[in-house]
């Protein structure tokens, strides 16, 4: 692992995983075995992690984790195939690693509201609507947070406002 990857896996990636409770996270990229090994201690006990490795060797190497940890699953697909397959699925956290070049923008669509995406510093940050996503560059990668929808005002009398006297 290079220094950038090391820093990302020590800071932003575990932060993305730590808050998901019983949710589902995905790590997407190539040759992910070393990264997954570093991140497993940060995965909450009731959470699940989908490992999406587009290299056959990387996916095979990650399968050894699945034998001992039932929270994990491995998919051997490219990021584009994964996005297509996951049309109905949303994730609480996405860890986007090298191997996803060109798919960064499309992966945003897989986040739940409130979901957290951690983007490796070698990748291009997606352009986002600030009303829908918070985005900040930490220097060790980019963090994206999907915002909940704005509350809609419903009709009816506003509380704390005096009624107009009936004429």
What are these regions (language model features)?
Residues 36-73, 80:
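Class I SAM-dependent methyltransferase SAM/SAH-binding core
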Residues 83-94:
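A short acidic, Gly/Pro-enriched loop at the edge of an enzyme's catalytic core
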Residues 2-24, 34-38:
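Conserved alpha-helix/loop element of class I SAM-dependent methyltransferases that forms part
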Residues 131-167:
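Core SAM-dependent methyltransferase catalytic element
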Residues 24, 48, 114-117:
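Short glycine-centered segments of the SAM/dcSAM-binding site in methyltransferase folds
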């Amino acid at each position: 692992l290079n220094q950038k990857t090391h820093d990302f896996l020590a800071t932003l990636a575990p932060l993305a995983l730590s808050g998901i409770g019983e949710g589902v996270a995905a790590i997407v990229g190539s040759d992910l075995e070393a990264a997954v090994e570093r991140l497993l201690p940060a995965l909450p006990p009731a959470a699940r992690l989908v490992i999406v490795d587009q290299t056959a060797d990387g996916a095979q190497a990650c399968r050894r984790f699945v034998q001992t940890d039932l929270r994990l699953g491995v998919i051997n697909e490219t990021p584009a195939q994964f996005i297509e397959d996951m049309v109905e699925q949303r994730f609480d956290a996405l860890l986007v690693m090298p191997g996803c070049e060109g798919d960064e923008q499309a992966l945003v669509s897989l986040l739940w509201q409130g979901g957290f995406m951690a983007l490796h510093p070698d990748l291009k940050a997606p352009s986002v609507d600030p009303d829908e996503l918070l985005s900040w560059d930490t220097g060790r990668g980019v963090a994206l947070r999907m915002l909940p929808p704005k509350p809609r005002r419903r009709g009816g009398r506003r509380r704390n406002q005096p009624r107009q006297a009936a004429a």
